[in-house]
């Protein structure tokens, strides 16, 4: 029993006896995000055909469209006035028409000896978002890599009580160009030598920053297509280097399954039973655990990509060995258990939060239970907690400039 008291669910699992969302402070669940304060369209937002037409409208030959795209996606440049290979007369016109400023850097913090960098951005309209760049040096088992955790919404409408972003509510969706621009900015940061040891460009992208990516499906999907398109029309990344996270918008998972883009799907599960998950993840009241895991299994079957099951361990809430056994059974009963990999996340603290990380012995027991069931499991190497840049901590302190709290 926890210090706050507990009860037992109909399935025999321990449940907190007090509400997990503090009374009077519940944040409403918002699945359909209002598109307020939308940014102007950017070159990145245009289709290949629209880019060709855009340069023609300025009296410039069609081949210039690919030239412009090469600057953007291969050299990560976004100021046409500096591009001497474009006709001088057209540079400012193109800049004014298709290159509005989308991200303005407000602040930048680093930790882990400079290998973790969190950037606070101001968007069009004043909303604030954050992205985190993490460099991992080579080890005996893996090559060096730079991973970018990017945002897809300003705020989040999923209202998860343990997540700083979710407790701030939702302001608006981000555009495709705003999403991709975070990657270009990270590449410029690496190229400038501002991340010790890193070279080249971002190797992996995780849609695990601010927002629920599946609630901004159209912009996120177009961003993924742009990031994975061959140069000069896109950034030229492998879809397998991208991870798309969701708390469980089942219809969008089913839609993604049919897209034919083999990104890694990460399911933020955090509880294997509906009784607890209804409290931790409010969207579970709409799409239950079985529906979610069925959709995830079908995604793995269709794409041949292993699904990542994200599970933040919270002291006396969801960290019991009995729950690990339930999670293992949920995975095993859907066939070959190697379709999923459990990624355990030590809960990261947020200012004023009553949520805390599991005791080491409880975390170890959880891992051992999964291993006894032969479930692939790892404990995440948490980065950036000193600068509030770790999982669940991104809140863009101050929320916005000119939009209120």
UniProtKB/Swiss-Prot annotation:
Positions annotated to bind S-adenosyl-L-methionine: 211-212, 245, 268-270, 348
Residues covered by the Radical SAM core domain: 142-386
> What name appears for this protein in its UniProt entry?
Probable dual-specificity RNA methyltransferase RlmN
Family per UniProt?
Belongs to the radical SAM superfamily. RlmN family.
So where's the catalytic machinery, residue-wise? 130, 391
Q: Provide the reaction this enzyme catalyses.
A: adenosine(2503) in 23S rRNA + 2 reduced [2Fe-2S]-[ferredoxin] + 2 S-adenosyl-L-methionine = 2-methyladenosine(2503) in 23S rRNA + 5'-deoxyadenosine + L-methionine + 2 oxidized [2Fe-2S]-[ferredoxin] + S-adenosyl-L-homocysteine; adenosine(37) in tRNA + 2 reduced [2Fe-2S]-[ferredoxin] + 2 S-adenosyl-L-methionine = 2-methyladenosine(37) in tRNA + 5'-deoxyadenosine + L-methionine + 2 oxidized [2Fe-2S]-[ferredoxin] + S-adenosyl-L-homocysteine
What the entry lists under PROSITE patterns is as follows:
RADICAL_SAM (PS51918)
Q: A Gene Ontology molecular-function term?
A: rRNA binding
Task: Name the Pfam families for this protein.
Answer: Radical_SAM
On whether Metal-binding is a keyword of this UniProt record, the answer is yes
Q: S-adenosyl-L-methionine as a keyword?
A: yes
Instruction: Just give the chief location class.
Output: cytoplasm
Q: What else is known?
A: Reaction proceeds by a ping-pong mechanism involving intermediate methylation of a conserved cysteine residue.
Q: Where is the composition biased (Low complexity)?
A: 1-15
Gene name of this polypeptide: rlmN
Q: Which CDD domains match?
A: Radical_SAM
What is written in the cofactor note of this entry?
Binds 1 [4Fe-4S] cluster. The cluster is coordinated with 3 cysteines and an exchangeable S-adenosyl-L-methionine.
**Documented EC number(s):** 2.1.1.192
